[in-house]
Amino acid sequence: MREINVSQLTDIIEKLCIDACYHLPCDVKDAIKTCRACEDGEVAKGILDNIIENYEIADADNVPICQDTGMACVFLEIGQDVHFVGGDLREAVDEGVRRGYVNGYLRKSVVRDPVLRGNTGDNTPAVLYTDIVPGDQVKITVGPKGFGSENMSMIRMFKPSHGIEGIKNFILEVVETAGPNPCPPMVVGVGIGGTFDKAALLAKKALMRPLNTSHPDKFYADLEVEMLEKINKLGIGPQGFGGKTTAIGLNIETMPTHIAGMPCAVNINCHATRHKSEVI
């Protein structure tokens, strides 16, 4: 059994919150540059040039990529041979988010009640997900999630008879309905299977996966390529002004489901798809 003091998580989460909001992952930058090279229209190229310039300034000056620094989603993959000591895990995670958003001068966007509102003032609580995995390590991933794109996300409980065409049409419907609202070019996370809640989580986790990776099953890997091509043929384009680049990536995550169902969730993210990880 390996003991880990929760204060280590606090320090790492503080750092990851700041790093994620200041610096886009390399796979996202590469995808944006690749799409820029493929664009024909001057408006679309100009917008992508502005996006590239924006993240280069953020890198150089250590400032947020976007004013919406999101709600902090924290994913912990906890080795089953780990024992946390030194305090409450939930409190340690929130303290890391609190410090990150205060010390990193990141916008505080969380309200304490969904209806009555009232800003918490420090961007807590985090949305915390935990998975138990083999081993004695902990992988920490922080993914700040802006809500211009989150509000465009949808879930649908398909019957098995709808088949793969039902899922394809739904993905296109979600993206087309979103239009310019999620600040395209977007990244599309798709979750298929599980239950109502699990499909949504799969879609969220799909957004954390690097854009230069594929689903391990060839059927879904091919579907990722096919749907990205179809989305980009919609012509929504960068910031909704038209062009070839409506999305820079589409990732699918799947799991088994009930014989009577085929849940599908689509989680939309803007081009500022932010996530950083560290293993202890």
PLM regions: where:
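Non-transmembrane, aqueous-exposed alpha-helical and coiled segments at domain scale
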Residues: 1-280
